[in-house]
Amino acid sequence: MDISSLLSKTNWTDPNLDLLIHEVVEYDMRDGGFSIIQEHRLIPEQEIQRIRRIKDKHERHVTVGNLSRNKDYQGLSKLMAEGFRQYRIAFGTTNNLGLDDIVSIKKDALFVKKYCYELKFGDYIEFREKNVYQGFLRIGKLECYWKEDSVDIKGVSDEILDAHHRDFTCKVIWRFMKYLVQFDNENAVKYIVRMMNDYKNLRLDPGYYRTFDDKSIYPVTTLGNQLIIKEIGPELLQFCNVEYNYKTVYIPLLNIATLL
């Protein structure tokens, strides 16, 4: 596979990479779909001008998304997808990226192992250096990107993470990865074993027991019935099925640490 074929993929992460202690730089395309619309004039000029007047980035993004589903612009979504593909390839080839430089590919972003300096293509397409991470860790289908003050998780929506997990499971992953980034494998093992014991014995805050996924619920068994609860107090914690996070987060972390 050559670099152009790889960058044609819309969603790809190196399947052979479970742990990387190395800088990973995230480059994303500014104003994603709208920049492609402007560059290739995919909609009438009056519509482009209308969207330009929308100052709020999220609102502009939603407006572009709605256009791509509008029957008056059939084919727009496909043209935008082709535009993303075209400029991912342009970014990679212009910056001489090799296959081994790519950690992950998203629709409008690349996670790579080196700094890139050719960021502007045409009049409207511009990539930006969004994040610089010091480590990468894969836990099942989750991708964890570590930096000194936080960990970014791909595979659970940011809204769910912000609402429920930043102070709990995300902190466990962040601290565990901090030990790995510092090449302190011994304390990484000690830390995760201690957390696993506290987790199994229900000594942690209820927030740690919320399933670490987009459902983000508490599976509870009481009186022989299976319940799905969105909020829980200490009195119900003893009925919570804690296996999900234990099997999908804690055991994989321990396996990674003990194999180093």
Task: Please describe what each predicted stretch is.
Residues 1-260:
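Conserved acidic
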